[in-house]
Amino acid sequence: MIKKILTTCFGLFFGFCVFGVGLVAIAILVTYPKLPSLDSLQHYQPKMPLTIYSADGEVIGMYGEQRREFTKIGDFPEVLRNAVIAAEDKRFYRHWGVDVWGVARAAVGNVVSGSVQSGASTITQQVAKNFYLSSEKTFTRKFNEVLLAYKIEQSLSKDKILELYFNQIYLGQRAYGFASAAQIYFNKNVRDLTLAEAAMLAGLPKAPSAYNPIVNPERAKLRQKYILNNMLEEKMITVQQRDQALNEELHYERFVRKIDQSALYVAEMVRRELYEKYGEDAYTQGFKVYTTVRTDHQKAATEALRKALRNFDRGSSYRGAENYIDLSKSEDVEETVSQYLSGLYTVDKMVPAVVLDVTKKKNVVIQLPGGRRVALDRRALGFAARAVDNEKMGEDRIRRGAVIRVKNNGGRWAVVQEPLLQGALVSLDAKTGAVRALVGGYDFHSKTFNRAVQAMRQPGSTFKPFVYSAALSKGMTASTVVNDAPISLPGKGPNGSVWTPKNSDGRYSGYITLRQALTASKNMVSIRILMSIGVGYAQQYIRRFGFRPSELPASLSMALGTGETTPLKVAEAYSVFANGGYRVSSHVIDKIYDRDGRLRAQMQPLVAGQNAPQAIDPRNAYIMYKIMQDVVRVGTARGAAALGRTDIAGKTGTTNDNKDAWFVGFNPDVVTAVYIGFDKPKSMGRAGYGGTIAVPVWVDYMRFALKGKQGKGMKMPEGVVSSNGEYYMKERMVTDPGLMLDNSGIAPQPSRRAKEDDEAAVENEQQGRSDETRQDVQETPVLPSNTDSKQQQLDSLF
C-alpha cells in the first residue's frame, strides 16, 4: 500500500516536473525569437555630451544630461576590474550569463518571503536590464533577462560585456561609467585609482545613493570592506593589501569641469546652431566643436565691457536684493543656504550671499558659499544701508533670507550690485569673418539674452559711412562740399508733420566737405547727401554690406541710422571697408569632430581676395577708410588714438536722447564693434555718447588684441589718386554735375530721379519685410542677403 502511494506521488511529481519543463521550453521557444536585436550592444554608442572648445582648446561649454567618457576595457585598471567582479559577479568568467548557484540561493529566499525580494543578477544580466528592460521586479521581466543574458553571452566576448557594463552603469552624482565616477568622486583619471578607491567605487552599482561615500560614508565603508574581503577570498589581493586599503584615508575631491566663463555667450550660439541641425541628438552624440574665439581675447573683451558698465553704475543708488529665500521653515538653515548658494555663480568677483540675520543696529550677518559667516556693519553696507529692513522697498529690502552680492576689497567685505546698464562687443577677422571675441552682456548667468546677436538696436551715426559710400559710388567725392545748415522738411515727420532734424551738438559749420562732415558726424550733411542720391538708390547699395531691407528705412531718417540691427551685423558690414571691399560672413564654428575623433565638418569661409564676392569698389573702400581715419585722429572717436596707432579707422554712434552708444573701429585685419545701452531703452545721460562710453571699451580690448602687431594700414588700390591731401577715384576728381545738391538753409527740393527712388524705396521696404530674400532688379546689383550667404557655408559645413 505504502509502495503504491509512493509510486503514485513520485509519478505525480515527475509529471509535474515534465509539465513544468515543457511549459518553460514552450516559453523559451516563443520568447527567444522575439528578443530584441543586439545591434545597440555590438555597435555601442553611449550618450555623450556636446563639448564646445575655444580655438586654443579650452572648454567653453558642455551640454547634455549624462556626463560620460567612453573608455576601452583595457584602459580600466586591473584593480578596478577585479573589485567590480568581486562585488557584482564573482563567477563572471565561469558562467554562461546566469549564475545558477546564485539564482538557486536567491530563489529560496524569494519563496520564503513570498515575493521577489532579491536577485542574483550577473553582470551580463545587468547589461541586459540596463539596455533593454525595465527595473520592475516581476518573474516575466526576470525570465526575459535570463534569456537576453544567454543571447548576449553567445554574441559578445566577456571583455566586451564588461566594457559595456563599465561605461553604461549609473554611479550617482550624474556619473555614468567608472571613468566619469573616478573624476567626480576623486578628481582623478580612472587609471590612477588606488585599491581602496576602486573598492569604494565598486560598491556603487548596487545602490548609488545608499553607498555614496560623500553622503553615507559609514554605509559606503561597510560596502568597501565587503568587497575587499571578497577580493581576498578570490585571491585577487593579499591580506596585507586588504588591511592597507581598509586603513587608507580617502579624500573626496569632487571634480568640477573647468568651463571658461568668459565665452558662455559663444557656447550658447554654438549650442543653438547644432540643435537646429541635429535636434536632441546634439546633446547625446559626443560632438566636439571647436570655435574661432580665443579665451585670452574673450577674457580681455569681457573685462573691457564690464569695466565700463561698472564705472557707469558706480554712482547709482542701491536697487535692492536680487532674490529672496524663505528660511522660516528650514530645519537646517546653514545647509539650506549652502544648497541654494551652490547653484549661483561668482561674477566679476561679486560673490553671492544670503542674509541670516539683521541686528537691532541694522547690521547684517551673511553666509557665503562654503558656509562662512560674515558680519557687515554700516560701513560695509555702504550705499545699501538704507535698504536694511526698509519696508518702503517692499520685497527688495535687505532682510533675513535676502540674496545679495558682496565683494572682498583688501580683506573687507562690502555690498555691491550688478550694473543695470548692458552692452556687447564683437570682434571679427576682417578677411574671413571669423569671430575672435564676442560678449553679449555683463553676465550670462543672470541674463542669457545675447545682445551681440539678438538685440535689435538703432546704430545711429555708425550707419553714416554706408550712406557716404553710396554717395561716392553715385558720383560724389571726399571733397564734395555740402552745407551743414538747419533743415526743415514738411511732411517728413510723424503723421505728416514737419521734420526738423538737428546736429547732436546743436552747432552748424556751413559749407564743409564730406570728409569733414563724417569726421564731425554732421547730421544735416548726411540728410542732404541722402536726398541727393535718393533713398531707393541708397537702400539698394547698402544691401551690399549684408543688411536686410527691413533694416533700411525707406525714409531720410535712414541717414541718421534709425533702422534696427545687431552689433554682429554692424561689425560684419564694416569688414567690407576693412578688407578692401569684400563681403565675408561672420561665423563662430571652425571644426566639428564626432565621438571617435573623426572630422565631421569644417567651416569653409569666404576669404577676402580669394573666394569672397566683391561687394563694393576697392577704391571706394579705401577712400572711406582714409576718411574714417580722421574720425579717430581728430573727430568724435579721437579717444581711440590713445592706442598710438596710425592704421586705425572707425565711427562713433549715438541715438536720440543718448539711449544707445556705439563705436566700430578697425584696421585691415580686425573689426571690433562695441554697443552700450539699457535693455529697456532709456537715456544714459551726458555720459552716454559713443565717444565717451563705447570708445574706452574698444580701446581696452584692442590694446590687447593688437599687441605686438604692426600697423601697416591699407594698401592703396590701383585707380586711386591723391591730390592736395585728398584721395579720389582716378576717373572722378570732381563731383558728378548730374547730382543735385541743394545747399540752401531751407528745405531742399529733391531731384526728380531721387523722388522716383524714394517712392520705389517705400514699395521695396513694404515688400522686403515679408520677403527678406527677394532680389530686386534696380539701379545697382545686389549681393545675396547675409542669411543666404551664410547658409551656403553652413551647407558646406554640415
From Swiss-Prot:
<comment type="function">
    <text>Cell wall formation. Synthesis of cross-linked peptidoglycan from the lipid intermediates. The enzyme has a penicillin-insensitive transglycosylase N-terminal domain (formation of linear glycan strands) and a penicillin-sensitive transpeptidase C-terminal domain (cross-linking of the peptide subunits). Essential for cell wall synthesis.</text>
</comment>
<keyword id="KW-0735">Signal-anchor</keyword>
<dbReference type="Pfam" id="PF00905">
    <property type="entry name" value="Transpeptidase"/>
</dbReference>
<dbReference type="InterPro" id="IPR031376">
    <property type="entry name" value="PCB_OB"/>
</dbReference>
<keyword id="KW-1003">Cell membrane</keyword>
<dbReference type="Pfam" id="PF00912">
    <property type="entry name" value="Transgly"/>
</dbReference>
<dbReference type="InterPro" id="IPR023346">
    <property type="entry name" value="Lysozyme-like_dom_sf"/>
</dbReference>
<keyword id="KW-0378">Hydrolase</keyword>
<dbReference type="GO" id="GO:0005886">
    <property type="term" value="C:plasma membrane"/>
</dbReference>
<comment type="similarity">
    <text>In the C-terminal section; belongs to the transpeptidase family.</text>
</comment>
<feature type="transmembrane region" description="Helical; Signal-anchor for type II membrane protein">
    <location>
        <begin position="10"/>
        <end position="30"/>
    </location>
</feature>
<dbReference type="GO" id="GO:0030288">
    <property type="term" value="C:outer membrane-bounded periplasmic space"/>
</dbReference>
<keyword id="KW-0046">Antibiotic resistance</keyword>
<dbReference type="GO" id="GO:0046677">
    <property type="term" value="P:response to antibiotic"/>
</dbReference>
<keyword id="KW-0133">Cell shape</keyword>
<dbReference type="GO" id="GO:0006508">
    <property type="term" value="P:proteolysis"/>
</dbReference>
<keyword id="KW-0573">Peptidoglycan synthesis</keyword>
<feature type="topological domain" description="Periplasmic">
    <location>
        <begin position="31"/>
        <end position="798"/>
    </location>
</feature>
<protein>
    <recommendedName>
        <fullName>Penicillin-binding protein 1A</fullName>
        <ecNumber>2.4.99.28</ecNumber>
        <ecNumber>3.4.16.4</ecNumber>
    </recommendedName>
</protein>
<dbReference type="InterPro" id="IPR012338">
    <property type="entry name" value="Beta-lactam/transpept-like"/>
</dbReference>
<dbReference type="Pfam" id="PF17092">
    <property type="entry name" value="PCB_OB"/>
</dbReference>
<dbReference type="InterPro" id="IPR050396">
    <property type="entry name" value="Glycosyltr_51/Transpeptidase"/>
</dbReference>
<dbReference type="GO" id="GO:0071555">
    <property type="term" value="P:cell wall organization"/>
</dbReference>
<feature type="region of interest" description="Transglycosylase">
    <location>
        <begin position="50"/>
        <end position="218"/>
    </location>
</feature>
<dbReference type="GO" id="GO:0009252">
    <property type="term" value="P:peptidoglycan biosynthetic process"/>
</dbReference>
<comment type="similarity">
    <text>In the N-terminal section; belongs to the glycosyltransferase 51 family.</text>
</comment>
<dbReference type="GO" id="GO:0009002">
    <property type="term" value="F:serine-type D-Ala-D-Ala carboxypeptidase activity"/>
</dbReference>
<dbReference type="InterPro" id="IPR001460">
    <property type="entry name" value="PCN-bd_Tpept"/>
</dbReference>
<feature type="compositionally biased region" description="Basic and acidic residues">
    <location>
        <begin position="766"/>
        <end position="777"/>
    </location>
</feature>
<keyword id="KW-0808">Transferase</keyword>
<feature type="topological domain" description="Cytoplasmic">
    <location>
        <begin position="2"/>
        <end position="9"/>
    </location>
</feature>
<comment type="pathway">
    <text>Cell wall biogenesis; peptidoglycan biosynthesis.</text>
</comment>
<dbReference type="InterPro" id="IPR036950">
    <property type="entry name" value="PBP_transglycosylase"/>
</dbReference>
<dbReference type="InterPro" id="IPR001264">
    <property type="entry name" value="Glyco_trans_51"/>
</dbReference>
<keyword id="KW-0121">Carboxypeptidase</keyword>
<keyword id="KW-1133">Transmembrane helix</keyword>
<keyword id="KW-0961">Cell wall biogenesis/degradation</keyword>
<dbReference type="GO" id="GO:0008955">
    <property type="term" value="F:peptidoglycan glycosyltransferase activity"/>
</dbReference>
<feature type="active site" description="Proton donor; for transglycosylase activity">
    <location>
        <position position="88"/>
    </location>
</feature>
<dbReference type="GO" id="GO:0008360">
    <property type="term" value="P:regulation of cell shape"/>
</dbReference>
<feature type="region of interest" description="Disordered">
    <location>
        <begin position="739"/>
        <end position="798"/>
    </location>
</feature>
<feature type="active site" description="Acyl-ester intermediate; for transpeptidase activity">
    <location>
        <position position="461"/>
    </location>
</feature>
